[in-house]
Regions:
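Secondary-structure end/capping motifs
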Residues: 294-412
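Short glycine- and hydrophobic/aromatic-rich loop-to-beta-strand nucleating segment
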Residues: 141-142, 285-288, 292-293
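Short, glycine-/small- and polar/acidic-enriched structural segments
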Residues: 47-233, 245-280
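N-terminal secretory signal peptides
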Residues: 1-20, 31-38, 43
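Conserved C-terminal helix/tail region of periplasmic/extracytoplasmic solute-binding proteins
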Residues: 380-476
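Sec-dependent signal peptide recognition
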Residues: 24-28
């Protein structure tokens, strides 16, 4: 494979490292030697060819959960696959999605709802797929200091005087009612209409008896504020703290480091993490067009191989590598926040009120609990939330949810990548689900803040459990 001339990267783009042609040549010769010696089996090497496209550009938003991309790049995992990648920060989630759809980006760190929404035509219509889930958990809900002062006295206390967690939205309800009595709207920010953050914030509010509003796309209303007690609006993640400080919103749901930034700046208090709303919830995915995966199948598998290795590196040995990862993420071309701010959540702790730092070892999970496997049930949960809040305007059969999940989530590609890594000796069989027995549906999940049970094989029954939200054949 020939060495290519690399263009000078633009500002805020990670510098392209020297391409280790010699390293890859030696690796290939070693592999063939192992093959001849019978150490590895022929099919693993014969089936996966060279990448059809070597030079790639991936997009991301400045959040700590873009870490698998940064680590795959910095640790040479992409290069090991013969891939020469540029990582480019994007202004917001819409710009990122449009970049993937129009081919300016070959793939991207995406909100899990984006490939699903695009495929069913909520917003921009395009068939986007994901063969890789990037992480579990990683978000929080923060309120302004003014709001915190009003809700804190009503929260039960631990023996040491700290607030008892998790803090439900029922404690926010009296504050919202005061705003309403004065004729003022209570406003909160989230990052995108089909973001986990939107659905987690809505879930938390509704569990506490506050209506977060409906969408009515069939009526031309995509505000998401119909019948709302709390008005939710979109703000790009890095702008959340400044928007809160300006008083434009009274709280927000966002990924890190933007909750911890509010703590460090003294402008707000995180009240709950998404781990406390739904333990080990699926968060971001790596998305690309279906057309890309069909045109460049070997490249696609090799991308997933590199990302799997990055996820494993981030979690191995009880997060031993996290401090190094934080140092990388703190660079301006990645997240660009202070080391201490990123470390506050990436290294197993999370700070709520200033000084109230608590152990949450699984606040960010990049590989444990089969975090990287693209489960169909994860896709179904997102689709149920789209239906619950009106983004899917009409009743759909359970079979429809399954069909969409299987169009978008691609465990077949993931399995191919995993089996290659096992054959190469880079990973173990135990690192992955049992592919021969795996249905793609997690067992029913029970650890939600409201005690509800989610069975991905029964989406309509799941929706029937909620007093707030659309269900059955209800329409706006």
């Amino acid at each position: 494979m020939s060495k290519k001339i690399v263009p000078v990267p633009k500002e805020d783009t990670p510098p392209v490292p020297r391409r280790s042609f010699m390293k890859r040549s030696v690796f290939a010769l070693t592999a063939w030697a192992m093959l001849g010696a019978g150490v590895i089996s022929a099919p693993a090497w014969a089936e996966l060819g060279e990448p059809e496209k070597e030079d790639l550009k991936f997009g991301f938003i400045k959040l700590t959960d873009m870490a698998p991309l940064a680590i795959a790049y910095e640790k040479g995992f992409f290069e090991d696959e013969g891939l020469y990648v540029k990582l480019e920060a994007q202004a917001n989630w819409k710009v990122l999605l449009d970049g993937v759809i129009d081919g300016q980006l070959d793939g991207a760190h995406m909100l899990a709802g984006q490939p699903l929404a695009a495929t069913i035509g909520f917003g921009t219509k395009a068939h986007i797929v994901t063969p890789f889930s990037m992480d579990l958990n990683g978000n929080g809900i923060t309120v302004s200091n003014e709001v915190w002062k009003q809700i804190k006295p009503n929260i039960p206390k631990l023996p040491d005087g700290r607030p008892k967690h998790p803090i439900g939205a029922e404690h926010l309800k009296p504050v919202v009612e005061k705003f309403k009595a004065k004729g003022k709207p209570f406003k909160m920010g989230m990052v995108f209409p089909v973001s986990t953050h939107n659905y987690e914030l809505r879930y938390w509010l509704a569990a506490g008896g506050l209506h977060p509003g409906y969408y009515a796309p069939h009526k031309g209303d995509t505000s998401g504020t119909l019948q709302a007690d709390v008005l939710l609006s979109v703000t790009p993640p890095p702008q959340m703290p400044a928007t809160l400080e300006a008083g434009t919103i009274h709280g927000y749901c966002v990924g890190e480091p933007w909750n911890q930034q509010a703590v460090f700046k003294g402008i707000g208090v995180p009240v709950i993490t998404d781990y406390q709303i739904w333990k080990d919830n699926p968060e971001k995915v790596f998305g690309m067009t279906r057309a890309f995966t069909e045109k460049y199948p070997n490249t696609t598998v090799r991308i997933v191989k590199a990302l799997i290795r990055a996820g494993k590196w981030l979690d191995e040995n009880n997060n031993r590598n996290r401090p190094e990862a934080v140092k990388i993420l703190a660079q301006s071309n990645y997240v660009g926040a202070d080391y201490e701010v990123i470390a506050n959540s990436m290294t197993g702790t999370f700070e709520f009120e200033k000084g109230d730092k608590r152990e949450i070892p699984d606040f960010n999970v990049f590989f444990r609990h089969f975090a990287t496997y693209p489960y169909y049930s994860d896709a179904v949960w997102y689709l149920t939330q789209m239906r619950r809040w009106g983004q899917i305007a009409e009743y759909k059969l359970d079979s429809w949810y399954m069909e969409v999940a299987k169009k978008v989530y691609r465990p077949d590609i993931y399995r191919k990548a995993a089996e290659e890594l096992i054959a190469e000796g880079k990973m173990k069989t135990a690192d992955f689900p049992d592919f021969d027995k795996e249905s793609g549906f997690r067992p029913p999940q029970t650890e939600f803040i409201d005690g509800k049970v989610f069975d991905g094989t029964k989406p309509n029954s799941y929706l029937e459990q909620f007093p707030i939200g659309l269900k059955g054949k209800e329409k706006i």
